[in-house]
């Protein structure tokens, strides 16, 4: 009895561990899906022409239009001292499955009149422009040939989260219904299958989106193409979610297999310990089993029953407790009948 209680405690701990891993996987996958930090990097954007805010880096050069030295026919041309990469500004960007946001720099000439006071404060602190952020739909940035793959990736990701939620609910129900081993066995089986399917779908979704992003980097709009990019924290969180999902599936499968082996072992021992139930074996089974497999006659040996196939493990779990109780009851009643019969024979003698 102590061994059985210890086994139930270990099974409950494994189910709890699977539920915790499933909950972590569900939270990580949902966060990564809604995040815009799958990929981060910088964009190389040409700086605007010489304006008031950049006058220190520009100089004027008068150029005659008709070759004459007359100042009335001369035009002033502005030149910039900056060369090479100094002519470009590097702005950060971040991209996710839904939106792609990039840093913008608003020049002084484009500022609203009400923003001049704010611009003077920025200029006094050494900042030449007001920084902001512009977000665009990543679906619009994706090349038309890759949009179907992106939609498929989004659908697979949502299905991945849905299966994770179902698996978590099944494991939570298994924890609440600890008194019914047959129901717990079925819930563990469905939860394990759901976790494995969700993990495979999540892996496919992550790989498809990565391919779509790389194609967008090469074939997307020129004003969006990043100069340097790398993976963001949402990308790593998505794969961490996949790892937790598969760990939950392995733990649930381990719990299911252990329960199956325990019930088979107990089922075999019950017939070894109670041979009186063997001649009435067909009466010990539930009606669904006796109707499915008609009995030819009473069984005379344990091996004759032991070689018969069991229709399902869950059915064996359902009738196991009933089988054991009936075996003990039949054994006690048989002993009582023999005692009464022997006493009657002695009185007749």
From Swiss-Prot:
Keywords, sorted A to Z: Endoplasmic reticulum, Membrane, Transmembrane, Transmembrane helix
Any Pfam family the entry gives: GSG-1
Subcellular location: Endoplasmic reticulum membrane
Membrane topology: Multi-pass membrane protein
InterPro entries found in the cross-reference section: GSG-1, PMP-22/EMP/MP20-like
Predominant location category: endoplasmic reticulum
Transmembrane segments: 20-40, 158-178, 189-209, 233-253
Cellular component terms (Gene Ontology): endoplasmic reticulum membrane; plasma membrane
Source organism, top-level taxon: Eukaryota
Job of this protein: May cause the redistribution of PAPOLB from the cytosol to the endoplasmic reticulum.
Annotated family: Belongs to the GSG1 family.
Binding partners and assembly: Interacts with PAPOLB.
Listed name of the protein: Germ cell-specific gene 1 protein
Gene: GSG1
């Amino acid at each position: 009895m102590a061994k059985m209680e210890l086994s139930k405690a270990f099974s409950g701990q494994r189910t709890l561990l699977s539920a915790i891993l499933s909950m972590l996987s569900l939270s990580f996958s949902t966060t990564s899906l809604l995040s815009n930090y799958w990929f981060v990097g910088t964009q190389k954007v040409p700086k605007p022409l010489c304006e008031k805010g950049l006058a220190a880096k520009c100089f004027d050069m008068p150029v005659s239009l008709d070759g004459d030295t007359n100042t009335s026919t001369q035009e002033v041309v502005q030149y910039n001292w900056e060369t090479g990469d100094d002519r470009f500004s590097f702005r950060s960007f971040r991209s996710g499955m839904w939106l792609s946001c990039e840093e913008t720099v608003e020049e002084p000439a484009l500022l609203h009149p009400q923003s001049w006071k704010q611009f003077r404060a920025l200029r006094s602190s050494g900042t030449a422009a007001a920084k902001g952020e512009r977000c665009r739909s990543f679906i619009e940035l994706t090349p038309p040939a890759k949009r179907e793959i992106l939609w498929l990736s989004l659908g697979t990701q949502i299905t991945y989260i849905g299966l994770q939620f179902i698996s978590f609910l099944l494991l939570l129900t298994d924890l609440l219904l600890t008194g019914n081993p047959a129901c717990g066995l079925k819930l563990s089986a469905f939860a394990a299958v759901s976790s494995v399917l969700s993990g495979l779908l999540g892996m496919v979704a992550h790989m498809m989106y990565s391919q779509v992003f790389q194609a967008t980097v090469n074939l997307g709009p020129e004003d969006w193409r990043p100069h340097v990019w790398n993976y963001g924290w949402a990308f790593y969180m998505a794969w961490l979610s996949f790892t937790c999902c598969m760990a939950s599936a392995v733990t649930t499968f381990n719990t299911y297999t252990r329960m199956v082996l325990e019930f088979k072992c107990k089922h075999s021992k019950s017939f070894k310990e109670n041979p009186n139930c063997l001649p009435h074996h067909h009466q010990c089974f539930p009606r669904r089993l006796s109707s499915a497999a008609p009995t030819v006659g009473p069984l005379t040996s344990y091996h004759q029953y032991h070689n018969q196939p069991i229709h399902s493990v869950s059915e064996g779990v359902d009738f196991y407790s009933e089988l054991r109780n009936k075996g003990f009851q039949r054994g006690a009643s048989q002993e009582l009948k023999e005692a009464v019969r022997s006493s009657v024979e002695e009185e007749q003698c």
